[in-house]
Structures are given as structure tokens and as C-alpha cells.
Amino acid sequence: MNILIMLLFAVVVGYVAYMSRGGNYFLSKSDSNMSLGLSYGATLISTSAIIGFGGLAGWIGYSVPLTMVIPFVALIYFATVYIGPKVWQANQEIGAKTYIEMIGKYFNSPMLSKLLAVITVGLIPFYCVAVLVGVGKFITTFTGIDFTIAVVGFSVLVFGTIVSGGMSSVIKNDMVQGVVVILGSLIVLAITLFSHMQVENFWSNLESAWTAVPEGDTLYKLGFTSFTSWPEFWSRGWLMITTLLVFTIPVGLITLPQLQTRWMMAKDEGSFKVIARWGVVIPALAIVTFMLAAIAANSYTFVTEGKTAIQAAGGTASIVPYWIATGFPSWVSNILFLTILAAAFTTLNSLMHLLSTTISNDIIATDTPNMKVAYGSMVLVIVLALVMTIAFNGQAAIIARATALYFGIIGASMLPVVIGMVYGLRNGKHAVASFLGGAATSIFWVLFVHFKESQLFTGVTLDFGVYNFVEPIVPGLIVSSVIYIALTKLRTK
């Protein structure tokens, strides 16, 4: 049944792309505020959010959604209704084909465009890994198809739709997938709240499930004490989830080029209230739903197997697929399989389109972008991402980590620049200095300080005590902000 669903999904997205052929491959105005809002909201959600952060919540407990929800919703809404119109106004003056081109022209700094383009292209494969690991795990769990075949086939499908329909295909497919994600999330939320969490002794079983965590486990070392409480204040775990969920994800989201592009496509300034509603509703609904579901799985697995959800599933990336396959009726599982495919597709097609336009328009700057370069760059990065996906599959919390890497470095580098644009600042040298400071600091933190990535990339971890668990965006954002503010103040004196 799930194989038929997957084939039907491929037919639908292929048909939408086919009907979009001949549309603008680059930027174009949206015909409908609702379609752009659905596209924006759908792009904000992905398998990395559903499976990666759902799995993180299933491993750690309620401190994950409770820490994330308020800053996530507040920042996304504020950024869309306040920063979004400023970005739109800037491009009305400039008329750029991509967000990266617009930033460079706004600050009259080709170097800023090139730096952002290079960083974006360098980091996209890591975010692709997060998406592909998530959807690959799901396809394998629900169909039995080999993991490698699953991720290769899904990547080819995304590539084909982008080549066929360009930006028009991306927006229209996002709109369809956004509706699917909303419906699927509502079904999971209803079953979680009114069925799973209503079983006798649910809360006491969830508390007791913590006893299945063995002494000396990573959770204890990080400072976590139960599924229903926050970790010890200023412990490794507290710093990890606070800097990840309050800074990396919300701040990273509002600076990502593929999301800023949606703002540039708005019909007018009045569009942003509609865009903001969908931009908050779709990701917040999906993230909270699957986090609550994954946490609830611990009560079930403890009663039935005497294990926590991560022990029963075999890893954080497997918690959500395992729970949907075992804890929900088969008809619901089929719908949720479609939901995950939709979430993965919206993110991957935005990333692939961003990558091709960045290379063909922003790195190789010509009056008429070379489409052969655009398509060829997609093929090369897809191959690289597939190799990385297969190599990194099985790494602990790889989905959440790969997502945080992309969000963190972009967020640390770009937030002061974006805020500077909002306030009408146009000094390109200041923007470049701030960008370089944020990028260099966050990359250094990734390579030599952060507890997980430093071991993965260099094998060298400088001992900063509990601060090894602080996300790279925090030091990077401090440095980039100080540089931008200091240079701006010095110039005004």
C-alpha cells in the first residue's frame, strides 16, 4: 500500500511540475497570497523538523517542545510581518533575480554576494543530508525499500520537477505539500491528545519510563533528570537545548536565503500578514505534533517492552517512524507516510532550486544565467549529498545536527546584516566585516569547540567545559553583532 502511495505522490508532483513548465526559473511574483503563504510555511517544515527534532524530543522529553515553541512562533511571526516587507521593498528598487544578488546590490558589495553564495553552496549538502536521512529512514521503514535506493530515487524525483517547472513548480508543489502536512499533523495531534495521552496511568508510566535509562547514560551526563522536567540549570544539556532551540533554529530560519526569496515574491506589503499566518501555523503545528507524539511513545514502549522509545526504535532518527508504524492504525500510518514525503519534498526542492540559482547566477555572474550550469550544479551536489547521507547514516542525532550546522552558520553570519538592511544601513564594508566575523567564529566553533561536530570534522575538541555544548550560532552571533554595531557607531561619530 505504501509503495502505491509513494508512486501516486511521484505522479502528482510530476504532474504539477509538468503543468508549470515554461515558468520563470528564477524569481517571479506570486499570483496568490495564500499559495505563497502555504509555500513559505511548507518550506519552514521538513523531515529534519518532524523526524529529527521529533526524535530529539522522544529521547529527551518535554523540555524540547516547551523550550522551542514560544521563541519559534514569536520570531517567525515578527520576522515575517516586520523584516519581510523591508526585504520586499528593497527588491522593488533593485529588481534582483535571487535573494543573494539582492543583498549584494543593496549594500553595493559584490563581495558580500559572493561570500554568502559560497557559504550557502558549501552548507546546502549538510541540510540535504538531514532531509534525506529522515525521508530515507521513513521510506525504508514503511516500504522495505533499501535506504540507498530510497534516497537516490527521491533525489532524482526532486531534480526532475525543478528542471521541468523551475520556481513556479517549487511554489505550486510547496502549496500542495503544505495542505498535506496540515492534515497529517492534525490527525496525529488528535490521536496523540485524545487516545495515547488518555490511557490509564499515562503520566506515571512516562515518569517510570525514565527508570529504563541506564546509569551512566548520556542523558544523565548531560544533566537531564526525567522526561517531564527541564535539565539541571546551566548543565550541558540545558545549554545544548537552549542554544539550539532558542537561537539556532528560530534565528537561522529567518535568515535562510530560500525563505527570504518567498518574501521577495510577495504581491505587495499587505501580503505579509497572510504569509505570516501560514508561516507560523504549518511549522508550529507539525513540530509540536510530532514532538508530543514521540514523547508519548516512551509511555507505550515502557509498558509493552520495558524500554524507552529510543531503545525500542534504535536511534533518535528512528523514533518517529517506529512510533507511527507501531502506535497508529494502518490507515493513519499511510496518511502520515504521505505527510513525511510532502515535508521532505518541500525542503529538498527549495534547497536544490536555491543551489542551482546561486551557482548559475550569484557565483558565476553573467547577464544571462547558464541553465546547463544550474542543472549540472544540482547533479553534483545531489551526488555529494547522497554520498554524505550514506556515510553519516547511523550517526547519533545526525538529522538535528546537520540542520543546526546549516542554520547556525547562516544565522550567525547574516542576522546583523539583515537587521542593518531593515534600519536602512547600506555600508557594504561593515556588512562584509560582520559577515566574515560571524562565519569565521561559528565555523571555528564547529571545527574545534562544539562537542559533536568537532569530533566529526577534525577530531580535536578544545576543552571549554560545559560551553562545549553551546551551539556555534551563539559565539558567531555575538562576534558579528559586535563588529557591525561597533563599525556603525564609529562611523557616526
Model-derived regions, located:
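Hydrophobic, small-residue-rich membrane helices and short re-entrant helix-turn-helix hairpins
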Residues: G23, G95-N108, G165-V176, T255-V288, ...
